[in-house]
């Protein structure tokens, strides 16, 4: 949005001999409380974690913080839409160009391949995945494997030391350290912001900050 300002005001009786210059000045955007305009889960312009952190460091109030306010109006939230991506119903046209693509086309036309997963336009959508059936078939087809020996106190996986939930008191302390980044059942935990800044501090608390002093 912009506002038009006329720089040359004219009288109603005066004769216009030249064009009046105009300047477009941007208007200040109005922030709305997020609770007053957002009534659904989807946010069309979700603020980034960096933007929220910057507003928190600046000490913005709730009517200026991007976590609790937005420039969008209620109509923008009601008209917002999104598209869920799915597997396309039609194969790519470039599959006939390469030998691998021709082989896949022949297998699919001959009925030797599993049919393509349903796309967005299918009636039975949403069917994101058949994970339960696939997992049961995978487990039933897999062979038996030997479990590790239970008498072994310390086990290592991919360079990580593991331990039992109830360790003995005499066990070595180094296995109590947490790896960084660490993992949980949902995946990798967020990395702390100061984990890479260990022993990397500009200057000292007890001396002058040298990196802010001009060298000339």
Curated annotation (Swiss-Prot):
Enumerate the subcellular locations listed in this protein's record, separating them with semicolons.
Cytoplasm, Cytoskeleton, Flagellum axoneme
Its tissue distribution reads:
Expressed in testis.
What is seen without this gene? Deficient mice are viable and have normal fertility.
Question: Which GO biological process entries does UniProt record here?
Answer: flagellated sperm motility
Concerning InterPro entries, the annotation shows:
SPMIP8
Give any Gene Ontology cellular component: axonemal A tubule inner sheath
Record keywords, A-Z: Cell projection, Cilium, Cytoplasm, Cytoskeleton, Flagellum
Superkingdom of origin: Eukaryota
Outline the subunit composition. Answer: Microtubule inner protein component of sperm flagellar doublet microtubules.
Instruction: Please explain the role this protein plays, according to its UniProt record.
Output: Microtubule inner protein (MIP) part of the dynein-decorated doublet microtubules (DMTs) in flagellum axoneme. May serve to reinforce and thus stabilize the microtubule structure in the sperm flagella.
The molecule here is called Sperm microtubule inner protein 8
Organism listed in the record: Mus musculus (Mouse)
Could you tell me the gene encoding this protein? Spmip8
């Amino acid at each position: 949005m912009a506002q038009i300002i006329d720089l040359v005001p004219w009288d109603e009786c005066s004769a216009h001999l030249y064009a009046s210059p105009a300047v477009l000045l941007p208007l200040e955007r109005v922030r709305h409380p997020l609770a007053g305009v957002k009534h659904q889960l989807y946010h069309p312009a979700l603020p980034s974690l960096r933007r929220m952190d910057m507003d928190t460091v600046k000490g913005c109030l709730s009517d200026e913080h991007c976590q609790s306010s937005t420039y969008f109006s209620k109509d923008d939230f009601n008209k917002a839409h999104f598209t869920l991506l799915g597997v396309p119903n039609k194969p790519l046209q470039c599959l006939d160009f390469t030998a691998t693509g021709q082989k896949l086309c022949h297998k699919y036309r001959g009925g030797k391949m599993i049919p393509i997963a349903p796309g967005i336009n299918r009636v039975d959508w949403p069917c994101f995945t058949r994970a339960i059936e696939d997992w049961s078939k995978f487990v039933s087809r897999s062979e038996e494997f030997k479990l590790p020996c239970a008498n072994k106190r310390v086990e290592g996986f991919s360079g990580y030391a593991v331990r039992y939930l109830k360790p003995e008191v005499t066990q070595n302390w180094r296995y109590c350290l947490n790896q960084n980044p660490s993992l949980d059942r949902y995946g990798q935990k967020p990395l702390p912001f100061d984990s890479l800044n260990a022993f990397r501090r500009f200057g000292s608390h007890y001396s002058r900050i040298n990196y802010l002093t001009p060298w000339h």
